[in-house]
């Protein structure tokens, strides 16, 4: 009898709280949106297609700001530059928070001590400043130039050695961006580099899968049912062990240098060639940061670097090459520019990049049509606010459809066409001030890795277009027939790999 009374009391209390919450929301002017079903919300409406495509279609029905429910999670979707500006500039502080109950980020961020998902506050400000000023600043990115050049030339030589044969260019591109990132992070080629890549590939495969438990934060038992968190923890343990070994090796090397009393000139030379782990360990040991930098903080930032500099960069490079090859006039103009400017060198290097106009426009146009993340990483409203005349309750998540805004005919002529010339002599840039074009996001949470990513796209693209003319296999038709189908993953890579036949250009240094 007592148990029955407790049960009835709990049920009445639950109903009372539900009624109170319902009355509170009914008093608000909420954004429009599709009617959610009990329990599942609108989950049934997002299956069977690419999320950013589905959300664009919904925006055509419900407007540039609409509300949708993923299970228990209320989310607003933004598809307009004007509203994105309200989110990222007017109310930037309110929307600078990240949701803290997504399985993949719970596990793989060292208790949210990375930059992408750290809670907005002193720690996040410190780590972002370190990232922008110390790790991925202009001078540091330039210092990685020799790594880029060497790794890209390795790729070019490999492709050249397979002239006339079918090459899986996509596979080589993904290997290239990983190698550049790994050497920038760890220094010389590490004996753990390949096994680390294998683990990161497995992690990426897991991270791309939706965990239904993320949509029901109050139902903790679902974590056990889906098993996603358990799998992630196993993977995380393996990745963590490799990263700790790499940090310990760096620490041992530093101690050896101290004991050997390296002279000042030698120190200066080495400091110019520091890798990212070195930079973070310098800050760790200096004691000059407001908050201590732990080994776990270093590992979290390294995983961030791989997230920004690995697959997303490779996907952009892959799209840029595919779009250039598919569009005959774009290919002709790009190759003419490159082969004129670098004719005497018979090779491309970054010292001549300031003379290029069309190649940077190709990169910008690729980012418009194929942004690295078609939907912005989720943010969370820290307090109730008003956006576009609608009330947004606290804890509401927000996603910005960056992909849709880059294809909006209101802001772009012939938005579905690949036209790099639209960016020549244009002041529109990807640095977060032009809200119709924010491939790296905007506001306080803008991606700090853009300065690292852009050269890692531009140099290999330039080399691949300079050194080779390209053909497809006879069964695949012509270059103009290349498909542009997206893979349904977060970074929107190509669904089908680029498999091409290289023909070495007569003016290339590869031609003996």
Curated annotation (Swiss-Prot):
InterPro entries: Cyt_P450, Cyt_P450_CS, Cyt_P450_E_grp-I, Cyt_P450_sf. Glycans are attached at residues 111, 168. GO terms for biological process: alkaloid biosynthetic process. Its EC number is 1.14.-.-. Heme binds at residue 447. It comes from the Eukaryota. GO terms for molecular function: heme binding; iron ion binding; monooxygenase activity; oxidoreductase activity, acting on paired donors, with incorporation or reduction of molecular oxygen. Belongs to the cytochrome P450 family. This is Cytochrome P450 71BT1. It comes from Catharanthus roseus (Madagascar periwinkle).
